Amino acid sequence: MPENLLDALLFGALPVVDGEVIPAAPSTPEALAISKDIPVIVGTVYNEFTPGQEDTIFRPLAVQQAADRSAAGCAPVYLYLFKWASPVLDGALGSTHCLELPFVFDNVLLHRTFTGGGEDAVELGHRMSRVWTNFAKTGIPSADGIPSWEPYPHNMVFDIKSVLE
């Protein structure tokens, strides 16, 4: 996909290549070479900005990033889809943009206006936070109550009952 088209689709929200801090655009051979030994988690939420329907902009880009890293022989890349839907506003948000962040950082109760703060949400937050913490420690995303997470092309679906596809 041409980079200017990608930039337009993402509303200009791409990393700015400055040649120093960000030396190359993600998924270019140069960027992949720099980070080839670093395991990565990449994923999206189910609805992003489209309540009631599956995301069609961010998800394909995340899958492509995982595919590119895998094809380049990089360290493992772990793909996820966050499908848990917020009950807030009678469920109108679904699994909206950035909803996984309170779960990854185990801040579900702190952000109950976004998450609803229910028991299932709190438990999922505990599990997801352990997954990310273990990944930071070992390079392997794992936690009790979460299926063994295999690298791409597998996909971890986080929900009340998480599953590996």
Residue positions per predicted region:
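A Trp-anchored, charged/polar loop motif used as the substrate-binding/catalytic surface
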Residues: 16-31
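C-terminal helix-and-tail extensions that cap enzymatic domains
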Residues: 1-10, 27-165
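Active-site-adjacent substrate-binding region
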Residues: 13
